[in-house]
Each structure stands twice: as C-alpha cells, then as structure tokens.
C-alpha cells in the first residue's frame, strides 16, 4: 500500500441510524481515535429522520447526514453507499465501538496485501460498558443469537502472518453471516456483486463467496465492542425486529445464508433451543472449557430467541402492510 497520508486509500464509514443518541457518541469517538488520517476517511450516516440528538452528535464529528426514507436499515446502507467515495467501505452500527486505534489501518493494509480475501471481519470483544448478558451474546457466541450460532459453520484458521489471520469455511458450506459490525470491504468487490441494486450486508459476503472469494481476514485481538442489547427482554424484542426484517427481505429475494449447508437445519436448531438438553450441555461445556460464568445465559437466551422469533412471525402476519414496521419495532439500546 502506498506510504504517505496523501497516498493512502480513502475509507468510507457507513452507518444507518434512528434515534441512537445513547450510543452514537461512543461509536463516533472510537472512529475519531483511529490512527488512519482524518483527511483520508469520511463518515456517512443514513438517518431515518431521528427525533433525538442523533444528527446533532453526528455533525460534531464531521459526519455527512443523509435523509433515509427507506423501509429498513439495509436500505439506509445502500443509500449511504451511493454517496460514498472511499476505496474501502467499513460498515458500522451505532452500537459498535472500535476497540483499537490501529484497527482500520491494519484492516486496509491487510486487504491490500491479500487480494484473495473478501474482507476483514471484526472480533467482538467484551467491554466494561456491557452487561454480562451482552458479553455472552457478542463475545462468546459472536453471532449474537443461539439459533444462528448453532446453524453457522465453524470457520477454520488457514494461516497467521503477524497480526493478520486468514479464515475460511469448511468444505463447501457458505453458512456463516458476514458483513456488519466493523466489517471492511473493498468498494470494487461490493460493486462486483451489484449491491447498488439491492443491498443486504450478509448477502454481499455470500455473493462474493459464491463468486470464488471464500477467504476473509481478521486482525488478531481487534474489532468492535458490540453493544447489541443489555437485557434478556431486550434480546427478545431485538430478535422480533430482526426476524420481521428477515421475513420482509425474503419477500424480495430468496438469498439466505441459513440455506447454504448449515451445521443443523433451522427446524432442528429451534427444537434444540426448547428441549433444554442441548443448551444445558453447551452451558456446561462452556463453563469447563472457558471457565466463563457468562455461559449461564445460554439456556435463557435459547428460550428468549425462540420467543422472539415466534413473536416476530405473529407480528409479520398481523402487521404485514404497516409502513415502517421494522423502524417501529426498534428496541431501546444503551450502554451499561
């Protein structure tokens, strides 16, 4: 990669927002701490007409704020992408905090040195600002949902070169959600799978893997603190919203990472969550292997996930034609 600030590739941070004043300053401050030169990156918010201080906070960090009239946050990302000028695209959400000042610098350098990789995935690291439940979801599960965690293929570490790790999925499985929470793409790769026409972050990575880019990178010990949700009830509401969004997307496209040879099918993952035996076994395994008491959240989270998904199906069927339904279902998110 070229040396000198003026020769560094431009980076665009893309973020959809809606009434996130409780989280946004924490997120944007972590971007401001990056070692990457400020004149070589831009921050673009697609804001769905927030009524709190979201826009005011964004502008104090020099962010470009766009009016997002779309029906969900993925449409907001597509809008922001249309205005982005960066060679590299970083998808962040307001509930993310980048953990290390050199993360973006290392991510961009690693992608420049590894053209075979589709992008850079964040590690999700615990933080004093999150509850033990949040740390269980994001740090221990990484996928933030027991059902998706059970279905996802287990990535394999291919090689490590200093701080940079190369990962791939086993066999011909593509069942692993990639693309959000600090994920770094090349703009050219995103354009190659036509994200400007229809965008879903996990679909972009899936299309790239189908096109032959099976490998992705991680920067060892670096990524984001993901303040996904702090409470079990908040998790139930979060799963409700996410599943309603998923069902809406499935009306438009049948692309679905959960159908790409998952470890277990969806129906079996749901049964696992309500039969207690599997969750208890994984709880005990986690307690022994990791010596981490946060695994005690696994059984309640399994039940909460099923409840949230069932509630989502009912919501989708009874409120299907309601305008901006996904936005209305947004649960409150805070730091601890």
Task: Name each region found by the language model.
Residues 46-55, 96-97:
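A conserved acidic beta->alpha catalytic loop
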Residues 97, 101-146:
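Conserved donor NDP-sugar-binding/catalytic core segment of glycosyltransferases
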Residues 89:
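Short aromatic/hydrophobic "clamp" motif used to bind/position activated sugar donors
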Residues 68-84, 106:
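Glycine-rich, basic loop-to-helix element that forms the pyrophosphate-binding segment
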Residues 30-40:
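Short, acidic, metal-binding catalytic loop of nucleotide-sugar glycosyltransferases
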């Amino acid at each position: 990669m070229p040396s000198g600030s003026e020769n560094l590739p431009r980076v665009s941070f893309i973020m959809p927002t809606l009434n996130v004043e409780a989280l946004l300053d924490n997120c944007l401050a972590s971007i401001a701490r990056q070692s990457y030169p400020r004149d070589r990156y831009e921050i673009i918010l697609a804001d769905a007409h927030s009524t709190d201080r979201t826009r005011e906070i964004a502008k104090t960090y020099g962010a470009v704020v766009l009016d997002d009239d779309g029906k969900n946050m993925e449409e907001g990302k597509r809008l922001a992408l249309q205005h982005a000028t960066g060679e590299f695209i970083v998808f962040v959400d307001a509930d993310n905090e980048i953990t290390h000042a050199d993360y973006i610098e290392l991510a961009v350098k690693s992608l420049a040195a590894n053209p075979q990789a589709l992008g850079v995935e964040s590690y999700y690291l615990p933080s004093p600002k999150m509850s033990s439940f949040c740390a269980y979801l994001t740090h221990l599960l990484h996928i933030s949902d027991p059902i998706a965690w059970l279905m996802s293929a287990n990535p394999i570490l291919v090689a490590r070169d200093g701080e940079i790790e190369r990962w791939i999925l086993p066999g011909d499985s593509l069942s692993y959600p990639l693309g959000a929470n600090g994920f770094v793409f090349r703009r050219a790769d995103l354009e190659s799978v036509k994200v400007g026409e229809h965008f879903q972050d996990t679909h972009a990575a899936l299309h790239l893997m189908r096109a032959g880019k099976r490998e992705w990178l991680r920067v060892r010990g670096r990524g984001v603190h993901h303040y996904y949700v702090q409470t079990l009830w908040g998790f139930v509401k979060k799963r409700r919203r996410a599943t309603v969004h998923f069902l809406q997307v499935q009306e438009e496209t049948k692309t679905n990472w959960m159908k790409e040879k998952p470890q277990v099918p969806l129906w079996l993952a749901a049964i696992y969550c309500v039969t207690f035996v599997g969750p208890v076994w994984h709880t005990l395994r986690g307690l022994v292997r990791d010596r981490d008491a946060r695994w005690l959240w696994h059984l309640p989270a399994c039940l909460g996930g099923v409840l949230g998904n069932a509630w989502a199906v009912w919501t989708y069927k009874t409120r299907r034609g309601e305008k901006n339904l996904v936005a209305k279902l947004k649960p409150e998110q805070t730091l601890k």
